[in-house]
A protein has these predicted regions:
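ATP-dependent helicase/translocase motor core
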Residues: 2-26, 30-310, 319, 323-335, ...
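Catalytic cores and motor modules of nucleic-acid processing enzymes
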Residues: 16-17, 23-25, 37, 46-49, ...
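Signature of the SF2 helicase/ATPase Hel1-core->accessory helical subdomain module
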Residues: 165-168, 204, 365-484, 493-494, ...
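Conserved RecA-like P-loop NTPase helicase motor core
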Residues: 181, 368, 393-394, 401, ...
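Conserved RecA-like ASCE P-loop NTPase motor core of nucleic-acid helicases/translocases
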Residues: 283-284, 309-317, 516-524
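Conserved helix-turn-beta segment of the N-terminal RecA-like "Helicase ATP-binding" lobe
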Residues: 318-344, 537-544
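Inter-Walker segment of RecA-like/P-loop motor cores
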Residues: 332-375
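Conserved C-terminal RecA-like helicase domain
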Residues: 484-625
């Protein structure tokens, strides 16, 4: 039997691969410490800047000045510094010798990748010393680091194949938490983790998320997992330098680094090749796969081609407030890109003719306005004549909505030199679904833009876990193709409202303790208004299903949005309806929108539906169902949105897939599918869906649509049968912990399969129609008691812990692959959320204090047995959030002693006041420990974001004046210099936020 490979052997092979060939990485065995890395950096800096330095070496003081000025406090700031300007990173230096002129030092030159002044080196086992501030800290060694011009930019951590690659991931996170990536290592932008057989990469950040680990995919769509093959494909020169210089984006809002995925990079390269040949084309990337990010980098990178004067990201005017443009602006804030927010075409014309090679984001309408002004005025035409000679590249996101064939032809005719066009779409138009014939106008995407340059379909995105598949439920009863009137009757619409609320229990996640949102799309504004009233009437009458009221008493929170013209006489009725809808909305959310603020109202609806803003991440600030006609069915990104209800006839293939794609963003473990429910023409919908998926999913529905009920049921029964081998043999279950490893793996695999199958089948509404099914097709999900389930889970978790601890003795005689990082998908979904617990307590108070008051019978209140369960629910909730559960437990005990005391109080306010008091005490203590300003500390905590490496308000909090005051008051403090104090404050603030403030102030559901 061959000896197991060691990390040292893997490291040696990796370095051999990296240094193989000409112009690759050069091994530097002499660099083993941070001071040695700095010395090497300065040597390269001097070599590359002899002219600027006038051959006078840098003095120690000058080196100290430079290192202080360029060293940043976190990965994001360091990456921002390395972004430089015009693809070069420079640092100004005033020389110590006043007789020497100031130097403009070139640190990194991304215009000369694999040439010029670029120096590529690899080091390994660099020592990073422990902090003097922590007795528990220890020295560390980094496995392999790649340096460009002396700066560490890519860090590789290795584990041997008998350990999961996630151990390398966790090790890097541990080093980050220990501040080992400070100093010169803050320049790292890309992290690579591998166990030899599985390799992933991820952008550097203060808090790493395993969901963002990326597998490299080659041109043939095959994963590259083996670490030496990954090194050849990704870490060789020039590719590694391109990853840092060209395939990295800085998100200004989230203050984080983004690394592009393989398919995005391949699309950029395809466009780059086409543009060098003067060819146009389009990119077909599935909705939800990051088209905007890809198109942004395309727009930026095209400027590397000298023949292109400017690139223009072209949008339609009505898309200006869309998420696409907002995202583009956040990426552009750290780049040389001008986002056109000019009020008129005059300013745009000036920007076009200013001679700067940059990217403009503008609207088609403003460009057309320039043309018209030139046509109507010879003076203006002469002034802007040079615009006609520009060589432009147009980037068009959602390319069919932004530009029609007629509009594109008009733009082409204006310029003397044919512009290049690159369209991005998730739903290309083919011959099968071509536009209506109109003379010689382009009818397909290829005719309009040119050939497809890169393709990444829905099927690809689902396979890569970028988006979810779809679960289709055709509820319509009629198939009359010529009788739309049937679907406009009161009988049909009332039945649809009732059925929507019945289905919402599962489609919107309420059955599993979640609460996802939905869009409800109709064929007309009038129909949408009628549905809005029907939903409101149903809510007012208390006709929402009891099981929904039990878990979400205020479900559904409804809104409606549609376009209104102030000038059209026929829109008066629509305005009246919208006024009522605004009044309802203002009452529900305590807002004050008027008819003159419809734009703001629509944005607010979008924000509450998207739930990306911190303000809208609690249930009481969110919407459950938004009624629309066509609005929000394209270009809207809301990961929490799970369901699309359609009471309209089937749309064309491209619009159908666009609409469906609102539902299939990945959100959490409970969201298994994008749920689609149709209420009209079921046969036509089935045919339309098949046609759409044939066009957009590589010719079929496999892997894109959820399995039908019988398939999912069979999978559940098979998994249950495997688990029954243990349930029906208690002795086997009891002895599992001491059983051979092979038997333990078999149980773990069976338990994971059962959990997955159970989570999947809970999404089917057939579970609620079991009495309508033949006895042979019925299943019972309740025959495993909570006690037995807890026992099974306990055994499973113990076995997983044992397997992790005993990897060196792993039994390789079995092919059973156990996912040791598997997260329960169904078992833990039975947890009751805080909202439900508080509603039970609230209704208990109302019941106990009836004394002549009528209790609201439509709401749930604890029955005698349920009253006993409230304590159990609180204990269950404590597993996910003990700090908040502690306060709820105290209130519940107090309520039972004296319910009258709470008769005129909202228990939610009592809870928040109690939590606020504890939070204040925690912050007062933290402020006292470090001499911090309490108000500034409160501001930092209120705005803290773990994904943001530079929390808002932190720089003001750690001001030197507070350190000076602290040291004056505590002369014997361990913090004798400002930087030590500042670093410890940042660490403690993060720790207190993570372990105390966030759990206290965040409702876990």
């Amino acid at each position: 039997m061959a000896a197991a490979v060691t990390e040292a052997q893997m490291e040696k092979k990796l370095i051999e691969q990296l240094t193989q060939g000409a112009n690759q990485w050069r091994l530097r065995e002499d660099l083993k410490t941070i001071p040695q890395l700095w010395a090497n950096f300065f040597q390269i800096l001097e070599d590359n800047n002899r002219d600027q330095l006038h051959d006078v070496p840098l003095t120690p003081n000058e080196k100290e000045t430079i290192s202080t000025q360029i060293t940043q406090s976190n990965f994001y700031k360091a990456a921002k510094f390395l972004a430089g300007a015009n693809r070069q990173v420079r640092q100004h230096l005033k020389r110590d010798d006043s007789s020497l002129p100031d130097a403009d030092l070139l640190i990194l030159d991304n215009t000369n990748i694999a040439g010029g002044t670029s120096v590529y080196e690899v080091v390994h086992q660099v020592e990073v010393n422990k902090s003097s501030l922590s007795a528990l800290d220890q020295d560390r060694r980094f496995d392999v680091t790649l340096l460009i011009n002396g700066l560490p930019v890519i860090q590789i951590e290795l584990k041997t194949p008998n350990f999961p690659f996630m151990d390398a991931f966790r090790q890097i996170q541990k080093y980050i938490d220990e501040d080992k990536f400070g100093n010169i290592y803050n320049f790292v932008e890309m992290l690579v983790v591998t166990n030899g057989t599985d390799t992933r990469y991820i952008p550097a950040g203060s808090t790493l998320n395993a969901n963002f680990l990326i597998t490299w995919i080659d041109q043939n769509k095959q994963p590259v997992n083996e670490y030496l093959e990954f090194a050849r494909e990704v870490l060789s020169i020039p590719m590694a330098h391109h990853m840092i210089a060209d395939y990295t984006v800085l998100d200004d809002n989230a203050q984080r680094i983004i690394l592009l995925r393989p398919y995005q990079i391949q699309a950029i390269l395809a466009i780059f090749r086409a543009s060098r040949e003067g060819k146009s084309g389009f990119v077909w990337h599935a909705t939800g796969s990051g088209k905007t990010l890809t198109s942004y980098k395309v727009a930026r990178n095209l400027l590397q081609i000298p023949a292109i004067d400017k690139t223009i990201f072209l949008i339609d005017r009505k898309d200006l407030d869309m998420q696409t443009v907002t995202a583009f602006q956040t990426y552009a804030n750290n780049d040389t890109i001008d986002v056109d927010e000019t009020a008129n075409s005059f300013e745009l014309a000036q920007q076009l003719g200013d001679g700067n090679r940059n990217v403009l984001v503008t609207t088609r309408q403003k460009l057309q306005a320039i043309f018209k002004r030139m046509e109507n005025s010879p003076t203006i035409a002469k002034k802007y004549q040079k615009l006609k000679n520009l060589r432009l590249a147009f980037i068009v996101d959602e390319c069919h909505r932004a530009v029609t064939p007629t509009q594109k032809r008009e733009l082409d005719r204006f310029f003397n030199r044919q512009p290049l066009w690159y369209g991005f779409t998730g739903t290309p138009i083919f011959a099968e679904n071509a536009r209506a014939e109109k003379g010689q106008e382009a009818r397909t995407t290829e005719q309009l833009y040119g050939p497809v340059l890169h393709k990444y379909t829905i099927e690809d995105a689902i396979h890569d876990h970028k988006v979810l598949g779809f679960k289709i439920n055709n509820e319509g009863d009629f198939n009359q193709t010529d009788n739309d009137a049937i679907y406009l009757t009161d009988m049909h619409m009332k039945a649809v409202v009732q059925q929507t609320l019945l289905l919402a229990y599962r489609t919107q996640g309420l059955s599993n303790g979640h609460r996802y949102s939905a869009l409800f799309s109709t064929s007309s504004i009038k129909q949408a208004q009628k549905y809005y009233h029907l939903f409101q009437e149903t809510i007012a009458k208390g006709e929402v299903p009891k099981r929904i009221q039990k878990v979400a008493p205020d479900f559904p929170r409804i809104a409606i949005t549609y376009s209104i013209s102030q000038n059209e006489e026929e829109s008066m009725a629509n305005q009246a309806e919208m006024k009522q809808a605004l009044a309802d909305y203002n009452k529900m959310f305590h807002t004050q929108f008027s008819m003159s603020e419809l734009g703001s109202y629509n944005r607010n609806v979008n924000d509450r539906l998207a739930c990306k803003n911190k303000t809208y991440q609690t249930h009481d600030q969110q919407l459950d169902i938004v009624i629309v006609v066509d609005r929000l069915l394209t270009g809207f990104d809301a990961p929490r949105l799970s369901t699309l209800y359609l009471d309209r006839s089937p749309m064309n293939p491209q619009n159908l897939i666009q609409a469906f794609s609102r539902t299939n963003r990945i959100y959490d473990l409970g969201k298994k599918w994008g749920q689609i429910v149709t209420f009209q023409y079921p046969d036509q919908y089935s045919a339309a869906i098949d046609k759409a998926l044939t066009l957009y999913a590589n010719g079929g529905t496999n892997g894109v649509l959820a399995p039908d009920w019988n398939t999912s049921r069979q999978r559940y029964l098979q998994s249950r049968q495997q688990l029954d081998n243990y349930i029906k043999n208690p002795k086997v279950l009891e002895t599992l912990i001491d059983a051979p490893q092979k038997e333990q793996k078999q149980f773990a695999k069976a338990f994971q399969a059962y959990d997955q199958a159970l989570a999947a089948i809970k999404t089917y509404d057939e579970l609620d129609k079991q009495d309508q099914l033949p006895a042979a097709e019925q299943i019972n999900l309740e025959d495993i008691s909570p006690e037995l389930e807890s026992t099974l889970e306990g055994k499973y978790q113990t076995i997983i812990d044992k397997l992790k601890a005993d990897r060196k003795n792993d039994d390789k005689s079995t092919d059973l692959n156990i996912d040791e990082d598997y997260k329960m998908e169904s078992i833990h979904m039975k947890e009751v959320d805080e909202f439900y617990i508080m509603s039970l307590i609230r209704n208990y108070i109302a019941t106990a204090n009836q004394s002549g008051q009528q209790v609201n019978v439509t709401q749930e209140s604890p029955a005698p047995d349920e009253k006993l369960q409230v304590g159990d629910y609180i204990a269950q909730y404590a597993k996910t959030n003990e700090p908040r559960a502690k306060h709820i437990r105290f209130i519940w005990n107090d309520v039972q002693q004296d319910p009258q005391k709470y008769s005129h109080q909202r228990v939610e306010e009592v809870l928040e006041n109690s939590i606020k008091q504890e939070s204040q005490q925690v912050l007062i203590q933290l402020a006292d420990d470090f001499g911090l300003d309490y108000d500034k500390l409160q501001y930092v905590m209120d705005n803290y974001d773990l994904d943001n490496s530079n929390p808002k308000g932190m720089e003001n909090l750690v001001s030197r004046r507070y350190f000076d005051r602290f040291k004056e008051e505590h002369p014997n403090t361990q913090f004798q210099n400002f930087l030590d104090w500042k670093g410890q404050v940042r660490r403690q603030v993060k720790k207190v936020y993570e372990t105390q403030i966030r759990p206290l102030t965040t409702e876990i559901s």
